[in-house]
Amino acid sequence: MPLKKNARALPVPPPPERRRFRRRLLTWYRRHGRDLPWRKTDDPYHILVSEIMLQQTQVDRVLPKYAEWLLKYPSMDVLAAAPEREVTETWYPLGYNIRPRRLQSIARESVAKYGSQLPSDEATLLTFKGIGAYTAGAIRSFAFRERAAILDTNVARVLFRVFVAKGDPKSHAMRRHLWTLSETLVPMRHVFDFNQALMDFGAMICVARNPKCLICPMKKSCRAYPFDAPISHRGHSGHGG
């Protein structure tokens, strides 16, 4: 769950800057967003499967396994009843084999306690072992279309570069601030598109190495532009426009 204590030690962008960021991001996404199968469903189980699979695994490796998995385990009930060894074998070769066990554990708890459904509220989602703050936010915004923030590696990198660009991006204090930024930026409408856009932007434009700054729609206001040195050594000088 996002930690809010002392999270506002760093300033959040004023409303005009937030609106400008949302507008530019959504415009870019509608032109360049990836066409992915889990974006064509609002089934909470399907969203859960995609989010667990995408942890530590590239999209192109997940795509065929996602389709295979849902063909074999089309519902929480089917997954909950499946033999554990079979579930692990079906997961191969995605790796990190704790993930299929946690996914099946979530399915079993959902069947036992919630009528084979995932709950939509954050507090209950966070009681499931294997669902953290990011996954809970993804389920709430992608499956239930609720106004919920997300913060994974890609999103954190985008927000840090565009709005901060100084300090240690991996510190606990910065992580709290980036959660606050994400919560502040989430729009009242188009939450699904906005959060998907953030992830795509971090995966396609604001990448970890050699980001595509020259074609970036945020370059006029990005605090890190142009990104040509370790971010922790850069300040706002000349790039806060």
What are these regions (language model features)?
Residues P2, L10-E17, R24, W28-I231:
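Catalytic cores of DNA base-excision repair glycosylases
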Residues H233-G240:
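Short, low-complexity, charge-dense intrinsically disordered segments
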